[in-house]
Amino acid sequence: MPRNLIDSAPSRRALAHMPDRRGRFRLRDLARACGVAGLAALAAPALAGEPPPGFARLSDLAPGVAQEMRYAGSNNFTGAPVPGYRAAQCWLRLDAARALAAAQAEARAKGFDLVVYDCYRPRRAVAAFVDWSKNDDEKTKPAYYPNVAKHELFAQGYIAEQSGHSTGLAVDLGVKGWDFGTPFDFFDRRSWTGALKRGVARLNRARLVALMRRHGFDNYPREWWHFTLRGAKNVESRDVEIE
């Protein structure tokens, strides 16, 4: 244990016991010296992985955005947690995270909050989608693609063998409590952004697109929830696990 960590503890109380022969302190001794907050700070590096250089955790910039990271659990079209998502966190490239934080600030000022379903997506997750498309398991078909053959999901543009999400510039999102006509990842023409001709859901889609456009994001026309920060070119895709 480096001496300065003990000397800088809030209580500045000396340890009641010396370290053992291997230089280890007992937990209760550390608790006396550092306090609960100090122990949390010492443990923090082991609790969360770091985003790649040039990326940020959205929670650090926009804590008001709800995070329902679907691919970290089984509530998604594959029916299982997806490789690459060891933690349910939204990582984005810093410029995209800042732009999304600005969109959330405008949303909050107008009385609503954004919710994200997917952000940066490791390449291994995209590869897992490809593998899933080739198996015979269709248990999620009624909920996610009732009107599309599984092998047609790529051809119809709902899943891609290379994803903009892997660059950290794309985000899937909605608004908490708003009706958008179809759920997230519902692969059907009804999910096309301009498919609805009337009703509250059509207006909500238009409002979301307008909000995101004001902050630099373009919508993918076949998915009302999918937005990509415009302007960036030749951006590297990544395969760092989210943890």
Regions found by a protein language model. Give the residues of each.
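Bacterial N-terminal signal peptides that target proteins for export
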Residues: I6, S11, D20-G35
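Conserved metal-phosphate-binding beta-hairpin within the catalytic cores
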Residues: F227
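Extracytoplasmic cell-surface/polysaccharide-interacting catalytic and binding patches
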Residues: A46-C119, R123-R222, R230-E243
